[in-house]
């Protein structure tokens, strides 16, 4: 596994929680928005995204609901209160880790 893949894998959960912060979104919309916002660095395939969303739902960080849009059913995901608290904590920890790593790399 390449170093970039390892780094990305370690931050995938944080990236998905952050993407859900702006409101409910269905999986493909989440994938597209994250890919576009990160210039393709985070481009989750279904084999990564759906199990992660399921895990976040089991941990009660995310909830989901089915909606009919244009005649098709889509599952929309949103952060729960617990998910928002976790996101705040993860951001704080990420920024501290990133700051510490910057001091090593400089």
Where are the regions that the model predicts?
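Short, hydrophobic-biased segments on the C-terminal half of alpha helices
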Residues: 50-55
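Basic, amphipathic "hinge/linker" alpha-helix immediately C-terminal to the N-terminal HTH DNA-binding motif
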Residues: 72-91
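Short, conserved catalytic or interaction motifs in soluble domains
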Residues: 22, 58, 99
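Amphipathic alpha-helical dimerization/coiled-coil segments
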Residues: 85-106
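Short beta-strand/turn micro-motifs at beta-sheet edges
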Residues: 2-6, 65-66
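Absolute protein N-terminus
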Residues: 1-2, 106
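Beta-hairpin "wing" of winged helix-turn-helix
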Residues: 57-73, 78
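N-terminal helix-turn-helix DNA-binding core of bacterial DNA-binding proteins
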Residues: 5-48
């Amino acid at each position: 596994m390449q170093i970039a893949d390892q780094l990305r894998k370690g931050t995938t959960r944080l990236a998905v929680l952050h993407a859900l912060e702006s409101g409910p979104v269905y999986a493909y919309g989440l994938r597209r928005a994250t890919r576009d916002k990160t210039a393709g660095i985070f481009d989750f395939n279904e084999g990564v995204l759906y199990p992660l969303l399921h895990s976040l739902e089991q941990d009660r960080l995310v909830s989901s609901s089915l909606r009919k849009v244009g005649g098709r059913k889509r599952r929309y995901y949103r952060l729960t209160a617990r998910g928002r608290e976790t996101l705040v904590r993860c951001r704080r920890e990420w920024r501290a880790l990133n700051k510490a790593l910057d001091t090593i790399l400089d």
